[in-house]
């Protein structure tokens, strides 16, 4: 799946963007002006997310829609966070004794893990006996006991079959953005509206919001071109002169072509002192092959730099190797599932981690970097059936730091990509202060892809709407534009 508006082949140079080899993080004056409004390129604006342990599983919704009202996860415990949707059967995301979970996350009732490495699977397939038929605490078994008949409108991520044959089974994923191309679009008329909104004393921010939030990215590029053709002026330069702060950052992000925005975000994350590793993970571990290849080409053409070389110089160890694997854009994207391969991969992952002293990191890297997301979901289910522990918990026990975060991001996207972004948005706004750069980046980049599903998962996971949380954490025109984008 590629972003709407992406070119089918290659990535042509963007008019007005900096020529190859220009080291400035923004194009020069007179071209595509980004200089002063954005946060410093080396800024460490991204908060640290706890490094290990996910909350107890809440069950993955089956095809047909949202869980019935009784199937929603209960309100979080004080200081806790809700369950992560889409987890295969088994132990859930709680970390066994000796492992560290997310701070404040409620842990499911413990089951016997024993000390040290997990027990070697018995011939029956489960260390220590039979796999429990239900989640701890009586939650429904994945996936058949979740009643979704009354919520048929919800586009779900179809659970994989429990039939472990060698025949492939097709899995489809349906997503939908909140922003769609406007009907009866007229770029010249929109350009005139924006010019009038910025003409004279003061700025009509509401007029700007009405146009920008209701046009697709491709239509915004046409408005930008029409503005220059009609008035001989650069629209972005005029907007920058009228706006400031978070509103300026949001407007500029909306007018960047999607691939350029991802490439720009990666450059910003690695430029200057320090590295914003969470940004590298969020982009490189969640994009499709086509998107990644276009990002790599755009990064080279617009900034005159090699993305892989920059990753190698800014990261190290197993985290570096994981990101280098990701920026190749060579993941298998076949949507069918080979259950025999899933069982074999599950066994290999067990033997590379829980079933031995130490960890064979290269085995985890190879499987998680090359298998399709539907195939990884089947592998996670096979792993839970075999090891009596979910693969996310095992990754938390075997890895730490950013490589752990990267591997878990891949697995979370395989389970339920909208839930991953919902969680990122939640932590961008939770607590004191707001990580506005993460909020802007996710809302903008997912607005034409799967923001509808992200909103649905946000409400299911946190018992409040995304719009409600945005309204409470932002203000003014910035809030109005964000709410207009998310459809609130």
UniProtKB/Swiss-Prot annotation:
Keywords: Acetylation, Annexin, Calcium, Calcium/phospholipid-binding, Repeat. One of its GO terms (molecular function) is RNA binding. One of its GO terms (biological process) is response to calcium ion. Residues 89-102 have a biased composition (Gly residues). It holds the Pfam family Annexin. Gene3D superfamilies: Annexin (1.10.220.10). Isoform 1 is expressed in brain, heart and skeletal muscle. Isoform 2 is more abundant in liver, lung, kidney, spleen, fibroblasts and placenta. It comes from the Eukaryota. Residues 1-143 are annotated as: Repeat-rich region. One of its GO terms (cellular component) is membrane. Residues 1-18 have a biased composition (Pro residues). Residues 1-49, 71-143 are annotated as: Disordered. Annexin repeats lie at residues 185-256, 257-328, 340-412, 416-487. The modification N6-acetyllysine is found at residue 233. Residues 5-20 are annotated as: 3 X 5 AA tandem repeats of G-Y-P-P-X. Interacts with PDCD6. Belongs to the annexin family. Calcium/phospholipid-binding protein which promotes membrane fusion and is involved in exocytosis. A pair of annexin repeats may form one binding site for calcium and phospholipid. This is Annexin A7. The lineage of its organism: Eukaryota, Metazoa, Chordata, Craniata, Vertebrata.
């Amino acid at each position: 799946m590629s972003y709407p508006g992406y070119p089918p082949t290659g990535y042509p140079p963007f008019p007005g963007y900096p020529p190859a080899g220009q080291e400035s993080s923004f194009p020069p004056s007179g071209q595509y002006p980004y200089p002063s409004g954005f946060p410093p390129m080396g800024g460490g604006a991204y908060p640290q997310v706890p490094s290990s342990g996910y909350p107890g599983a809440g069950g993955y919704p089956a095809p047909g829609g949202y869980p019935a009202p009784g199937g929603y996860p209960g309100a979080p415990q004080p200081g806790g966070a809700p369950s992560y949707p889409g987890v295969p059967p088994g132990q859930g995301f709680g970390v066994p004794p000796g492992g560290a979970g997310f701070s404040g996350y409620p842990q499911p009732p413990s089951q016997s893990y024993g000390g040290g490495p997990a027990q070697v699977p018995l011939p029956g397939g489960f260390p220590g006996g039979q796999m429990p038929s239900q989640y701890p605490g009586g939650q429904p078994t994945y996936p058949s006991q979740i009643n979704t008949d009354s919520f048929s409108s919800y586009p779900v991520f179809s659970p994989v079959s429990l039939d472990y044959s060698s025949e492939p089974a097709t899995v489809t994923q349906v997503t939908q953005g909140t922003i769609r191309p406007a009907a009866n679009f007229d770029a010249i008329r929109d350009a005139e509206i924006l010019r009038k909104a910025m003409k004279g004393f003061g700025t009509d921010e509401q007029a700007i919001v009405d146009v920008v939030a209701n046009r697709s990215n491709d239509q915004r590029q046409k408005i930008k071109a029409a503005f220059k053709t009609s008035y001989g002026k650069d629209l972005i330069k005029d907007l920058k002169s009228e706006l400031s702060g978070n509103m300026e950052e949001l407007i500029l992000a909306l007018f960047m072509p999607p691939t350029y925005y991802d490439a720009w975000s990666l450059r910003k994350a690695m430029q200057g002192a320090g590295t914003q590793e969470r940004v590298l993970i969020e982009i490189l571990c969640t994009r499709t092959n086509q998107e990644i290849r276009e990002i790599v080409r755009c990064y080279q053409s617009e900034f005159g730099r090699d993305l892989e070389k920059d990753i190698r110089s800014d990261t190290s160890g197993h985290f570096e190797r994981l990101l280098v694997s990701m920026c190749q854009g060579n993941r298998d994207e076949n949507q069918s599932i080979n259950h025999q391969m899933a069982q074999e991969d599950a066994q290999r992952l067990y033997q590379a981690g829980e079933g031995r002293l130490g960890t064979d990191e290269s085995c985890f890297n190879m499987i998680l970097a090359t298998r399709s997301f539907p195939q990884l979901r089947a592998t996670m289910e096979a792993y839970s059936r075999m090891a009596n522990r979910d693969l996310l918990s095992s990754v938390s026990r075997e890895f730490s730091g950013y490589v752990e975060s990267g591997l878990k991001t891949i697995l979370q996207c395989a389970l339920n990509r909208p839930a991953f972004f919902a969680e990122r948005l939640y932590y961008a706004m939770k607590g004191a202060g707001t990580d506005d750069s993460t909020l802007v980046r996710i809302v903008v980049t997912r607005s034409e892809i799967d923001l509808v599903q992200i909103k649905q998962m946000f409400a299911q996971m946190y018992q409040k709407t995304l719009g409600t949380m945005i309204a409470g954490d932002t203000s003014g025109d910035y809030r109005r534009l964000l709410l207009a984008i998310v459809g609130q």
